[in-house]
Structures are given as structure tokens and as C-alpha cells.
Amino acid sequence: MKTPVRALLITGFAVACAGPSADVTLGAAGPWNEGYGAMNKRGIDLAIEEINANRGVRGRPLRLLARDDGADGAKAAAIALEFVQNPAISAVVGHVNSSTMVAAAKIYDGALPAIATTATSPDLTGISPWVFRVIASDSATGVELGRFARRLGHTRAAILYENDSYGRGLADAFRRSFDGTIVSIDPIPSGNGDYEPYIAFLKTQSPGLVFVAGTEESGMAILREARKQQFSVDFLGGDGWTGIVGEPAAQGAYVGAPFTASDERQEAQRFVAAFKARYGMTPDGNAALAYDATKMLAKVIEEVGPDRTAIRDYLAGLNERRAYRGVTGVIRFQPNGDPVGKTVVIARVNRGELTVAGSR
């Protein structure tokens, strides 16, 4: 099957370079019905609305072809092939999940530039010179979270992780960086599963902190179960937890977030105000990163046009002077596609908001 697929990719790429359409078009893929996916989509849509309200890109409307990959690798690969073969699409915003981006990257390689929004797996580092991301890798984030847990004064920690690219990578980085005793490491089901036995077991291990490498859905369920069993320890999650703020049981939990709405920088506050006005809610890191990726691609196309190779080359060649200055910070890329200098903000859930946390 390898030869026919490669032939299709080459054919699709050749067609895509044949000439521009009347509009400039971006592809986007993610699990739009999930909480974090919906936030990604809102960030993308807001960016496009603002761009089109300001003469579009090169005086032409910026359009979006969005596809729902359901956080499924096979669907993501099929969507990637569709995007590659569509001559109107100049670049892709997404994918959102690590596993779907890994699957899609093999299709985009050599054919279509893509900027992952919230895909953090170390497996993406260097996967293709056509794939970039605007969020730090788990290998960097997990180290920061492990060190933060130690700064909180904890010497005993437990780890729960979703058994996928994201969960495994983040959990391993935390484990390696936590300068204390790891009392247990356990894989957990994704989604709104039954976490009663996990919390019951953790209570027998007496950790001071539980690190959870998973998404907001499993995170909220775990925190509810911990409250139910009166298991009062510190909980810490990665960027997958940025959407847990509305859960009452999340009060006091720590989150390694790529962005917080309390960021006082002018560009960040402009984005927060615009997002609240448009959607009636506070944006999280998912929305901010997707917004930045979309605005960044629009700026690149404004500079070099809709040609795919020109876009890829411009992204790869960004230096400190030409770096994109977005709501999540300054963005340029290492040769392996990871962002330069991107870090996480350690925040704490406080009455439905994320506020920057300090060590105690």
C-alpha cells in the first residue's frame, strides 16, 4: 500500500502548487465536540473573523475548511490526505491531539505545512520538516512540573496517566525530574471512567501530591472522586487540564498551562476581551494557542503568498527578529519543529479561574 499512497501525495502536492484560488484557505482538524477541541475551534474562528474584518490576507478573504477527526488517528490520517490533495488549502492549523498529529504528520511530510496547536508528545519532535507546533513538548513541560512539585515541598508523589502518546510522554518527563519518591505509577482509562479504585489505592500509598497526565474529562472525574473519598492532597495536571476550571472539585488544583487569562500583557488582554465579547466565556490555553497558530499562518501568507513550500520555508527560517509575537508569547521554531523557549505557566484553580501560582 505504500507506493499508491505516496503517489497520491505527490500528485496532490503537484496539483496544490498549480495555482491559487480566489480565497486563501486553511485546513483545520480536531475533535470539535470535546471541551478542549471546542476551545481550539473558537480560537481559530475568532482569529479568522478578525483577519477578515481587516481586509483578509493579501486583500482576499481567509477561509477555513474544518474537519472533525474525533481524536482518532485513522480519521486524522484520512483528513490529512484530503487536505494534501485539495489545491485550495495552503496550510493546516492542527491537529489538536498528539496521537492524531503523529498520524497526520506522515501524510503532511513533503506536501503541506501544518502547525499543531496543543499536541505535546515528544514523538512529534523532528517528525517532519513540514510540521511545527506552538506549544512546548511534554519533555520540557513535564520537567518543569516535576521541579515545581518539589518546590511545593513534596517528597512523595503518585502518577496517574492516560495510556496514549500524550499521557505516557508527560508522565515519564515528570517521573524523571521529580527529586523525590514516586510511590506509584498507574495507567488510567481516558474520559469519564470509574476512578473509585484508583483513589482508594492512592490513599493507601500516602502521597503528598498526585500528578495526572491526562485530559480535562478524566481530570474532572478524578478530582470529583477524590473529593468524594475525602482524599485531600495536592493535585497537579499538565496543559490537558486547562479546561477543568469550571469543576467545583478542581478548586485548589495546580495546572501547567500554556496561557492564563490573567496574563497582563497588552496583546493577551486584547485577546481575552475579544474572546469574552464573542463567546461570553474566558479563553483558556487551547483557544489562545489555536488563535496564535491561525494568526501566524495568515501573517506568513501575507508575506510570501499561498504557496505551500514558501510557507514552510518561511516558518522554518524565522529568527528572533522576524518571530511572530502572539498572545501566548514570541513564537519561532527550532530545526526540529518545536518552539523556541516556550514554557508553561504554573497556575492554580481559584473560583473558576486560573491564577498564577507560587511555591509555598
Positions of the model-derived regions?
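Extracytosolic ligand-binding ectodomains
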Residues: 2-13, 17-360
